[in-house]
Each structure stands twice: as C-alpha cells, then as structure tokens.
Amino acid sequence: MPESFKALIINQEGENFNREIKSIDKSFLKHGDVLVKVDYSSLNFKDALILKNGARLVKEFPHIPGIDFSGTVEESENDKFKPGDEIILTGWRVGEIFYGGYSQYAKVNGDFLVKKPKSLTSKQAMILGTAGFTALQCSFTTKTTREELLLGEKVENVIVTGASGGVGSIAVMILNKLGSNVTAVTGKESNKEYLKSIGAKNVINLSLIHI
C-alpha cells in the first residue's frame, strides 16, 4: 500500500465543526485486525447527520465517517480473511465509534466483515449498501421464517412507508419481485410514477390526506 492515502476527516474544536479531505498514513487507523483497500462506500441518512455536525453520534474527534464500504483485503491478522478477499461491511457502528469507509483504506475488526458474493461487483454491493441490507431485513419480518422468504412464498398485501427513500425503494422492489401487492406511501405526488415503475401497484400520497 502507499505510504499515504486520502480520507475524509471530520473534526470538532469547541463550536467549530469542519470536514476536510486529508492525506494520512496507516498509523492514523486505530482499530482492527484487517486492513482493507476501500473500493466504494455510500451516503446513508446517518452519514448525512454525521457530516452535518456529528449529530452526537461521534464521540471522539478527529474521525473518519462512512457506515459501510466494500473493498479488498490488503493485510489480515484474522484467520477468516486473507489478502485479496473481496469484502463488504455494513453496521457495527463503524463510521460512528470506529473509523469508517470514507477513506481509501480502512482498518476494522474482521468479525465485522463478510465476503462479497461473486454475483455482485464491489460497486453493486454499495449501490445496495446499508439501505438494501435494511430493506431485506424488513422484508424478513413480513414472513414466518427467512426460509419462506427465500423460497419465494409471497405475502399478498404489503404497505411500504417512506417508499421513495433508499430503504423503502429497495423494499418495494424486493416485495414486488416476490409477488406481493405493494402499496407505497409517499409525501410527494411527483414520486408516484417512479414508485409504480419499481413495482408499486398502488401509491398513497400523504400530502393529499387531511385529518
């Protein structure tokens, strides 16, 4: 790996909050037993809050945000991974407590990582990212068991709120693919055609409902 690399660093000094892309070296990365060359990360709602002002989610500064990433193992002291393994990370408070994915290299606990499926490119994995993982987990809760979901047994009618957001959009796609009759709930009339194009059979516009 290079002697130095780029990372987005946030810092708080008194009332001053700043964000800056800086050159750092490996010694800056504090935690973990696996060093990853980061290919992609994504911008999640929690990331936006942290980038705005730390949102009380970050306790120590300076800090590298980014709650998910995909990439390739560069160095490993963890028996589960070896250099060259393609991995995905989402969650585990990475980007909050631990340094995150807005860096060309990340060092994390190997227990936080999973190997990337060969059916996805590194870029595709982060297009889905934390939002896709969350949507799939939410879809599990509509079934009796995870196995039923994977077998494709459908729930007849499902309402997805916040349907035009990252999690909601992917949930609409997943449930439509499984054969459910999806009703999407949104706050904007302009989202109607988009939601129908990704699989919603019905769209409820909350802005037109007066109670």
Residues of each region from the PLM?
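Glycine-rich beta-strand-centered segment in the early N-terminal region that forms part
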Residues: D25-L43, G54-V94, G100
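Mid-domain Rossmann-like dinucleotide-binding core that forms the NAD(H)/NADP(H) cofactor-binding site
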Residues: M126-S207
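Residues located in well-ordered beta-strands
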Residues: K6, E20, K37, S70-T72, ...
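Conserved small/polar residues in nucleotide/adenosyl-binding loops
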Residues: I209-I211
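A structural motif shared across PLP-dependent enzymes of the aminotransferase-like
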Residues: G95-G110
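Glycine/charged-rich beta-loop-alpha catalytic/anionic-binding loops adjacent to active sites
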Residues: F112-S122, L150-E156
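Cytochrome P450 core scaffold surrounding the K-helix E-X-X-R motif
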Residues: K46-A48
